[in-house]
Amino acid sequence: MTSTSPAASTDPTEDPPRVPASRVAPAASGLAARADRLTKVYGTGDTRVVALDAISVDLPRGQFTAVMGPSGSGKSTLMHCLAGLDDATDGSVYIGDVDITTLDDKRLTRMRRDSVGFVFQAFNLLPTLTAIENITLPMDIAGRKPDQAWLDTVIDTIALRDRLAHRPTELSGGQQQRVACARALASRPEIVFADEPTGNLDSRSGAEVLGFLQRSVREMGQTVVMVTHDPGAASYADRVVFLGDGRIVDEMVEPTADAVLERMKRFDAAGHPSEG
């Protein structure tokens, strides 16, 4: 699915078009990230909560993975631990070949800066900077010059070249989130984590952002992991990982919105996974 036209939709009853196979970039070999028996526990005694229960998952390079599950299933905690934003209680997390659970704070900060891109529900753009200044800000802070050819590719893919001199208040919500996506990709990170990236957008703007994330994977060879509650958004991914009670309970390859919606219905009223 390459279109970011106004007709695109994240309606769970409507499957988005797919990028033609001839336009899909070959997947890079190896893993962008992985977790090995990752466990996260909050509290002690009567207040002890196991948010992640010995999860093992591989995230191949050049793949778009969506993470889904009911509220409290551990999906955001999983993303935060994979991205090095939260510490694991037990187990290991790798970005590339580096076990980030062994890094001190300084090296972990450097790893996140150099190897990880983030897209959040809030756009987090600086209002006094232009779109292009927001896109290059992380590299400017790190004292790194952008790869101009790659930056041009990213800018052309978000289709906002004519808006680069505009400040966030002069952009629509969808345009601001596309700028945030470009900022995450500008440094060519090992992996991009997106936490409900369309949560503040209408269906048209959300489809534009999801289309951009999908093209960044299929045409540019990036790796994206997205947490979402929306079956329509998940259908843009190559693979969906379903969480329940802090464990991976199912996976789906080449998902459709309808298939994802049906799987989500199999969680019971309390949010626990069901085999029914």
How should these model regions be labeled?
Residues 167-177:
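Conserved ABC ATPase signature
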Residues 98-99, 145-163:
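Conserved ABC ATPase "signature" region
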Residues 91-99:
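Conserved ABC transporter NBD signature motif
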Residues 192-195:
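Catalytic Walker B motif of ABC-type/P-loop ATPase nucleotide-binding domains
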Residues 188:
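Conserved catalytic motifs of ABC-family nucleotide-binding domains
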Residues 247-271:
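Conserved beta-strand-loop-alpha-helix hinge in the C-terminal portion
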Residues 129-137:
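Short coil-to-helix segment of the ABC ATPase nucleotide-binding domain corresponding to the Q-loop/switch region
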